[in-house]
Amino acid sequence: MVLQKLPLIGLLLLLTIVASPANADGPVCPPSNKLSRASFPEGFLFGTATAAYQVEGAINETCRGPALWDIYCRRYPERCNNDNGDVAVDFFHRYKEDIQLMKNLNTDAFRMSIAWPRIFPHGRKEKGVSQAGVQFYHDLIDELIKNGITPFVTVFHWDTPQDLEDEYGGFLSERIVKDFREYADFVFQEYGGKVKHWITFNEPWVFSHAGYDVGKKAPGRCSSYVNAKCQDGRSGYEAYLVTHNLLISHAEAVEAYRKCEKCKGGKIGIAHSPAWFEAHDLADSQDGASIDRALDFILGWHLDTTTFGDYPQIMKDIVGHRLPKFTTEQKAKLKASTDFVGLNYYTSVFSNHLEKPDPSKPRWMQDSLITWESKNAQNYAIGSKPLTAALNVYSRGFRSLLKYIKDKYANPEIMIMENGYGEELGASDSVAVGTADHNRKYYLQRHLLSMQEAVCIDKVNVTGYFVWSLLDNFEWQDGYKNRFGLYYVDFKNNLTRYEKESGKYYKDFLSQGVRPSALKKDEL
């Protein structure tokens, strides 16, 4: 299905891209009559992203230990679309070929993650270090650098060592803090001399909410009144505890990073994943007020804490005793504990205030006193949603979210760690259909334009952008049915890669203008 047209889309390639006046505060954008790399400030990085569990495979090589998702998908195959990451897209064996695919796209950077159990098979250094696993990431990082691609490394992208999960419940226990700091410090010391961009945690909201409040992702915990599939868990409690331990772990890891001599000159942050919200009913003042509350619960929960040192006051007021408290020392470590804001943006929703919460059935969504709606009070959808789309497409929300972060958090540096379009092709899935991904191409066009407007008009300090994803891969509870890649992976025929129309578009977009690697370092 061809994507429904939205305002500006028909004019996109004819539009004269706004240039910044040279004396304006904020980013300076060159004049351009076509949206491309040349429409952005010099030095702006463009790349693609993946995560270890979603692409590597090779779960029995390099003495890798079991990860949370390995066991979860074996125990509950129906909750992983009867798929798993045992082989994934075999990036472990094909990374050199895949790096050539990155070069083909003219990208500058690649976001990857390190699998904790591939480094410490049993979760802790004292129980053994996999030197083969350590060497694999050295080889991967070196190959990226050799090919002119800057590595961005995520320390934790949801692959908790199963041994720690079995021993004390993983992030449900404060014992995770010491173990995570040890692991993070190890990878900083090992790779910090050549990796200068780090992300401690990917999407802490998704990890805690989906894993411990609604049970849609591993470890699949929640109360039965939220999801009957959950066999254990306590909604409205565990998600807050997990995030609390995660944030303290982040602060400890950042302290270790800032003491790392090899790491000098680098930056560290978190990749957040909020939606943007519009009022469900513009005539209802409560819906308007609910937007700030929604953003505090989905973004401020983590970003307020790592910026100001504590949770948003509205969360303290509503959640009450169920929200753990930080010590004075923890607050001091958390405050200003990031060098940039990592942002993953996919979609937006309407925010409808919740009239009658049920205190006997607490959960994160109810605590925020809103419901998420895909249509407003007038029955209009937010953006568009093609038949195969996983999420509604609303690029205006991208720009609004960027401006919100600039205004609330004193204009921090922002890096777009993920932005992409997922689609489920179903019975029509084939190489021919999957590579003709015009909807994804239009999604990228519109979101790149919205980001360019945020940078060049709103003066938001965005410095990098990564498409999710380089390749179709294992998409958690959706398995392999939900495709996000710029390259189609043929799961029926040797995992062969095929460039999609979106990949051709991104390559053309990046072919114009000066790559950061072509600039002198003192010009950046």
UniProtKB/Swiss-Prot annotation:
The gene is BGLU23. Expressed exclusively in roots. Glycans are attached at N60, N461, N494. Homodimers. Binds to the deubiquitinating enzyme AMSH3. The inactive form interacts with PBP1/JAL30 to form the PYK10 complex, at least composed of PYK10/BGLU23, BGLU21, BGLU22, JAL22, JAL23, PBP1/JAL30, PBP2/JAL31, JAL32, JAL33, JAL34, JAL35, GLL22 and GLL23. Optimum temperature is 35 degrees Celsius. Optimum pH is 5.5. It comes from Arabidopsis thaliana. GO terms for molecular function: beta-glucosidase activity; copper ion binding; fucosidase activity; protease binding; protein homodimerization activity; thioglucosidase activity. Beta-D-glucosidase active on scopolin > esculin >> 4-MU-glucoside >> DIMBOA-glucoside. No activity with pNP-glucoside, oNP-glucoside and sinigrin as substrates. May possess beta-D-fucosidase activity. Required for the beneficial interaction with the endophytic fungus P.indica. May participate in the control of root colonization by P.indica by repressing defense responses and modulating other responses required for a mutualistic interaction. GO terms for cellular component: cytosol; endoplasmic reticulum; endoplasmic reticulum lumen; ER body; nucleus; peroxisome; plant-type vacuole; plasmodesma. Coiled coil: none annotated. Changing C29Y: In leb-1; loss of homodimerization resulting in fewer and larger ER bodies. The active site is at E203 (proton donor), E418 (nucleophile). A motif (Prevents secretion from ER) lies at residues 521-524. A beta-D-glucoside binds at Q54, H157, N202, E203, Y346, E418, W468, E475, W476, F484. InterPro entries: Glyco_hydro_1, Glyco_hydro_1_N_CS, Glycoside_hydrolase_SF. It catalyses: Hydrolysis of terminal, non-reducing beta-D-glucosyl residues with release of beta-D-glucose. Residues 1-24 form the signal peptide. This is Beta-glucosidase 23. Activated by tissue damage and upon binding to PBP1 or PBP2.
